[in-house]
Amino acid sequence: MNFKSITLSVFGLMLGAASMKAIPYSPEYLQENAEAGGNLQYISYGNFDKWLVRHVKESGVIGGETKTLYCIAPNGTWNNNNAYHGAGGSPWATSNVMAKVSGITKTNVSVYREARAGHGYCAKLVTHLEQCKVLGIINIKVLAAGSIYLGQTQEPITDTKNPMAKLNAGMRFNKRPKAIVFDYKVHLSGQPNRIKQTGFGGASTVAGKDYPDCILYLQKRWEDAKGNIYAKRVGTMVHRFGSNTDWKNNASFTIHYGDITKQSFYNSAWALTSGAVTKFAKNSKGKMVEVKEVGWANANETPTHIVLQFDSSHGGAYVGSVGNTLWIDNVRLAY
């Protein structure tokens, strides 16, 4: 996910007073099936009908506004600046985060609860410019994407060191689904190119259109005596949404098992994670460490964890197109 840009956008806005390299989109990498067959099982809270609403007051030096942050969790309301670490057993986290640095509180809001006729609520993910004025004078703008994912953010964010290490990515999972199934709607910005806006200076142009995405990894993880976490990739599904569409219900995307590097649909978007896109997880000692993907598992292997994310933009830190929007609902796994 574009978590690094989300994390740094919060800090860029504060200090100006969670990256991935962009991968070209190609339609041949789409793996959508028309129908969702077999036994369907919801991911917990995956109907997005329950939301915890947080009202967080930002610091006076940047305006002192009260921002609304939506969390995928049991219904409730928080009127405080308490850190959020999950609630009610929900496995979901979002790019709506709170940071506290040097006594200054700042938020990013890029995921929203939205009513959906006949279906309760859905999740709305938006790429936007996060803005604030410092002392009412310095106007800072940073591009940030909307993301929802299985895992937990280490809130409050307190520094900009190693932003991906603020995300405990994935959850325990030992099944072998054949596909991920969900409802979705897409609105693309319509811009032929993206922009990069870091909060320092103006926006610059990045070649290529911006696309929302869904990424699913099944991993077999293990930990050594020193607390290092390793993984082999058991299953993979990567999809970029290449056109505007009204709601598509029960869209099914095949999960491919084992070494897929020789498959016709394979490109670097499906590759093992390394470098800036390396995931992190909390080890048995309570420390956040890299999840080092060291190879492809056998196609008949059983995973230990699932990594799943939806993003309104697929680019790197600070990169995207303002207005890109992805709506997601009813996330299930097909067996």
Across the structure, where does each feature detected by a protein language model lie?
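Bacterial Sec-dependent N-terminal signal peptides
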Residues: 1-34
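A generic structural micro-environment signature
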Residues: 7-9, 54, 192
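Generic alpha-helical propensity signal that fires on short helical segments
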Residues: 18-19, 66, 198-202
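Aromatic (Trp/Tyr/Phe) and Gly/Pro-enriched flexible surface segments
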Residues: 24-177, 196, 207-258, 269-334
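A short beta-strand element within beta-rich, extracytoplasmic domains
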Residues: 176-186
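Short amphipathic, basic-aromatic surface patches that mediate peripheral association
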Residues: 184-205, 314-317
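Substrate-binding/catalytic groove segments of enzymes
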Residues: 192, 261-268
